[in-house]
A protein has these predicted regions:
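Extended, charged catalytic domains and RNA/DNA-binding interfaces, predominantly
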Residues: 1-208
Length: 210
């Protein structure tokens, strides 16, 4: 009610609240997948509980110091492909209730070169699309009802920050992420700085310098 007084709408569109990037221990994250759906159902209108799916250009293969990092990630990707994804799709369908609470199939891909991206599918039986790069992923997505959008764009380029040289606005990527739990990608001076172990947000990779 207060929002309508401050910013009245000229249309009859409604506001819905959701979370389109929510991790759990299906791959690497915290908490049971069912708990994630239950928590979302209790307070939101829609959700995508998003597994980590791939990292085509994961570095460090020849560095024994990084073996544990590689094993941590690739082990999760393997679990997803050995029954985890099917369980995820089944539970997403279980919680999807038209007119009450909507679920979306999504998954995340990491990339040193292009930056991390998230797929958000319209179809509740969407397959896990394998790719050799983010550009390959976008090419394979053509003709499907799916968005492939950049995530935590403000990190350093070349280390999972977004590669703006590859940005093309269109049906596959109609929007980009401004906020996430990582922080604000708009500016290096804005609130909510990037505090993850991938480093700070250099101004050259934020939205204002795109």
């Amino acid at each position: 009610k207060e929002a309508k007084k401050i910013m009245p709408s000229a249309s009859n569109l409604k506001v819905f609240w959701g979370d389109l990037h929510n991790h759990c221990n299906l791959t690497y994250g915290h908490g049971d997948m069912r708990d994630a759906f239950e928590a979302a159902k209790g307070q939101l209108d829609f959700v995508s509980v998003t597994p980590h799916a791939m990292w085509p250009d994961i570095p460090g293969a020849n560095d024994p110091r990084l073996k544990w990092v590689i094993d941590y990630h690739t082990g999760a990707f393997k679990r997803l492909r050995e029954g985890g994804y099917e369980k995820y799709v089944k539970m997403s369908n279980e919680y999807n209730k038209e007119g009450e609470f909507l679920t979306f199939i999504g998954y995340e891909a990491h990339s040193m070169e292009h930056g991390d991206h998230v797929a958000l599918n319209y179809d509740l039986d969407a397959p896990l699309v394998e790719c050799t790069s983010i550009e390959d992923w976008k090419e394979k997505a053509k003709g499907h009802k799916v968005f492939v959008t950049p995530h935590h764009m403000g990190y350093q380029g070349g280390y999972r920050g977004y590669n703006w040289k590859c940005f093309t606005e269109g049906d596959i990527t109609p929007f980009v992420e401004m906020y996430s739990r990582h922080g604000l990608a708009e500016s290096d001076q804005g609130d909510y700085p990037y505090l993850h172990d991938m480093g700070p947000r250099p101004v050259s990779y934020t939205h204002l310098r795109a």
